[in-house]
From Swiss-Prot:
The record marks 357 as: Transition state stabilizer. Monomer. Part of the Tricorn proteolytic complex. The gene is trf2. CDD domains: M1_APN-Q_like. It is found in: Cytoplasm. Pfam families: ERAP1_C, Peptidase_M1, Peptidase_M1_N. It comes from Thermoplasma acidophilum (strain ATCC 25905 / DSM 1728 / JCM 9062 / NBRC 15155 / AMRC-C165). Binds 1 zinc ion per subunit. SUPFAM superfamilies: Leukotriene A4 hydrolase N-terminal domain, Metalloproteases ('zincins'), catalytic domain. This is Tricorn protease-interacting factor F2. Substrate binds at residues 107, 236-240. Zn(2+) binds at residues 271, 275, 294.
Amino acid sequence: MNPGIEKYEIRFDFDLKDFTYTSHERIHLAGDWKDIKLDAVRLSVDKVTCNGQPMRFETGQDTVTVKGSFHDKDVIDIDFHAKVSDTLMGLYLSRTKEGTMITTQFESNGARMAFPCVDHPAYKAVFAITVVIDKDYDAISNMPPKRIEVSERKIVEFQDTPKMSTYLLYIGVGKFKYATDKYRDIDLILVSLKDIKSKYPLEIARKSIEFYESYFGIPYALPKMHLISVPEFGAGAMENWGAITFREVALMATENSGSIMKQNAAITIAHEIAHQWFGDLVTMKWWNDLWLNESFATFMSYKTVDSFSKQWDVFADFIRSETGGALRSDSLKNTHPIEVDVKDPDEISQIFDEISYGKGASILRMIEDYAGYEEFRKGISKYLNDHRYGNAEGSDLWTAIEDVSGKPVKRVMEYWIKNPGYPVVSVVKSGNKFRLTQEQFFLDGTRGQGKWPIPLTVMTKSGKKAMLMEESAEIEDMVKVNVNSSGFYRVSYDGESFETVMKNYSKLSNLDRWGLISDLYAFLISGRVSVDDYLARIKGFFEDSDHLIVEEIASQLTGLYLLKPDSNRIRETAASYLSRQVVALGDKQKGEDDKISKIRGIVTQDLAMVDDHFASDLARKFSTLAEDPDLALAKSIAAAKAYGISELASAADKYTDDEIRVRIIAAMGWCSPSDLKSVFELIDKGTIRKQDMLYVFSNMPANPKGRDFFFSNIDRIVALMEHAFEGTGYTSRILETAIPYLGLARYEDVKKKAEQIRKPSYNVGINKGLETLEIVRKLYNKL
């Protein structure tokens, strides 16, 4: 019998004055062990026994090893103590004006920071948790309380969990406020330190559970679900089984919130609830299959929200955010396969990226289109039923879908997940036919190899046709290749082919039109299309008023402006297009479509970045942030440029609503260099919370006037990020974004600095940033 853990019984006794805890842990072993090596970080182990007998143990830097031979049913008892962490990982302290809470973030390897354990997703066990706290506090864990005893202190003993991985355990302590709802016999509980204004998040949760139970054919497994608002939280949200944690902003959405906040909240809640089946009920064996958890939850969250909010057109956002972001990232040479070999725990956080989430989700969308909607759904249901309460691999899922659909899903998926990158399909008209060939697409313009089995779709005059393109293909009729941008590849048309597509423009969906524009921008960056040709072609889309098309064009033109602000033709093209959109959208109207409100906010903030005169006029409306939350970021950026950081800091202290407050904080990155030095003071003071630093530091290098300051203070910024966001990968992503901007003016200095600060935990971000710098330098010289 292989060694394993049957059950953990852990009692946490918290001292809420100095935020320490003492703990007694009982581990029920399964199978035979020779020395028990437990993961343990920053824990002080006092005593270890086996079946009541004292045992010798050795403490390493991040382990405690109990020496000896052990057998099935043996019981290990460990006494230990520790401090509650001040980072945003492990068992940590989260402070806000409304109070203090103890919370946990254990994914991917944070459980070892709270208690000795085998911190490995395949070592599933039952958890029996007891928490001892001051009697005026409450405690939350994955299961409902079994017993609560109150005398001098409060003892909360929770029901046993199902078998689950260590990273899904949750412990929360605080003076909480609650709102409740019910779905069937499942208690839905919204938790916050702040007053709760709306049950909107519970409504989303109820609809999501209902959708998933119907889609998977499997009931939700636990008797309750907490949605927990955490004031200081490094991740966006976390799928702890039955006790899901979120940043405050995700759970503060109400029926009257801005469209951006409502939609983001719905997608986030639906994503985490999808994990209750895909990740919690069935878990990957090791982190190389992390993508399976995250990509599936990403794809399903959009399907879920689309099922009850058609008016949002959420798959337009999916295609731009998830597919578009992944296509950009995966065209670098410093990409990685969807299924990546993970050995070092420091590597895990860096694969929580566009590939694990966006590419994986986009591949699932492509396979659903290839296998068929119902066949895909039945395959998913079979996979979950076959592996419930256990662990599985990606191949198990492909086999299930293949068994149902009868198509070679496993062969197709194995190639797509084990190989980095993706193809560009070239379409060349030859006589009365169209010749299709493929090669790997690289953003640096080099020509790649690779022969993907592409589930190709073609819109023809007679309808949609599908085929599996292995190397090349020839077709007689073509309106457009890659129908609804369902495939994860780009399409390059020769002149005649492109004319054919544009003649049929009115027949194309907005997802199809987005594909044309997205590919055009990628071909500009890679040098396949000249700047003149790009500008000529993109102007052909300027009359398209669809929200997805406007957002994509606005993003492209603003991105080019930020790359080279002193390029007159880019600045004039961007300002002209954005101004026309702002005028066309006009002021907010009562009862208007949420998509209109959302795109108004986006083009207005982009214009505030591009046009200082517009920003100066818009800044006068800074006092009206609450009137239209979708315009809050635009007005805040304008105020940052016109008034400075003191005005923004005062407003941030005034607004307790995170929907507005976070946008004010983000806009601080757009202040002048003389103001930016105050950012560190505001972090120390708490005006900028630890979790919100990343918004400021991601905007600062995008701001042409903020780049010198960022570079001069990069060591301090990295140190702050690493301390606050240990194990999350955020530092890596900030550096990936910043390095290309910083290097345009100081190429050699930035390359040298990148090597000086390089560490394993953000090595990937530095490599991607340096590669992107080389690419944008070439484009910069052409603009």
